[in-house]
Amino acid sequence: MLIKVFGAAVQGIDATLITIEVNSSRGCMFYLVGLPDSAVKESHQRIISALQVNGYRMPTSNIVINMAPADIRKEGSAYDLPLAIGMLGASEVIRPDKLNRYLLMGELSLDGSLQPIKGALPIAIKARELGFEGIIIPKQNTREAAVVNNLKVYGAGNLKEVIEFFNDKQELELVHVDTRKEFYTQQNSFDLDFSDVKGQENVKRALEVAAAGGHNILLVGAPGSGKSMLAKRLPSILPPLSLGESLETTKIHSVAGKLGQGSGLISKRPFRDPHHTISTTAMTGGGSFPQPGEISLAHNGVLFLDELPEFNRNVLEVLRQPLEDRKITISRVKCNVEFPTSFTLVASMNPCPCGYYNHPTKACVCSPGQVQKYLNRISGPLLDRIDLQIEVIPVPFEKMSDSRPGESSADIREL
């Protein structure tokens, strides 16, 4: 008996439909074709265990599974659920009449419970585009996928629930999310506020200009002058995300597996601050099957590079093209993937190796040659892409001890 079940492969931040064809006939062999990776091939053992634990027998017939289109590499364990359902459907354990109405994805544990997957949001968007009635995914991913309108999103806790759903013995949990209500309720709630900052009026003004015009900015100052504190508060004065920007940002974090369990739309601009030991691949994205890097996770938000000269020079130089093009294309033998990279770059650095060049009270111990060598770690082409460069002077004690609150982020946004 030939059965078709539908899943999806995520490439970049978009999904592609995968048709899983399962044919059951006389014999006792198992074949899985269609360019699966090792994790997909290992699904056979997970499915056997999951079925046994839940009181079902593995079909003893000859089973051939084809994952089409065959030119797309299928990776990861998220195909466990559609493969298991397809095998049971071909063996007539499951009624096949509803299989073509739903798209299924989920990783199986040995006890049959479903584990969360990456890319649930782009998968849900693709399911709606193709006219599916709904999708069945792990419960942990349902809020993320339920932001897609006009699509039924069902959450399942284990394999048995899905089997009984297709046999009309049990209803799965149908998840609804009021996308607009959730988006606008959380939009302007920030943990950090500019009212915490004492003094630094000129730096605040520069950050306001950067926020209003989308300009990159470099903060140069001694240790303890407040560079990081100011940079971390920049998202609180940026224009609020639009619903379209929020959806795109959420897709990127969904593909990277960075959304927390039960998370829905990202309603605030992301802030990413990687350590200076980061590799080039982690910054730009990549891998055998390309995943978003820090510059893509900062899309529509802020990328903060603290201690800029301490970053590997190659890591800094690869930022030049994404800063210009607002996108990055990662090329591999098997595929080319494009990720968006429209972010505001905020960088900070000390003025010299010791950190106290031009300090009002402390003496610098660096020679002119050491200072120049330190500054030369940042190339001219990269500095040319940073529109605003401002010196951050340490705040005197008198201003630090002032009990009056500073201007709030909400007031700055209204200017």
Model-derived regions, located:
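P-loop NTPase nucleotide-binding/switch module
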Residues: 170-209, 213, 240-295
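Walker A/P-loop
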Residues: 218-261, 325
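The Walker A (P-loop) glycine that initiates the GxxxxGKT/S ATP-binding motif of P-loop NTPases
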Residues: 221, 285, 307
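Phosphate-sensing "switch" segment of ASCE/P-loop ATPases
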Residues: 338-342, 352-415
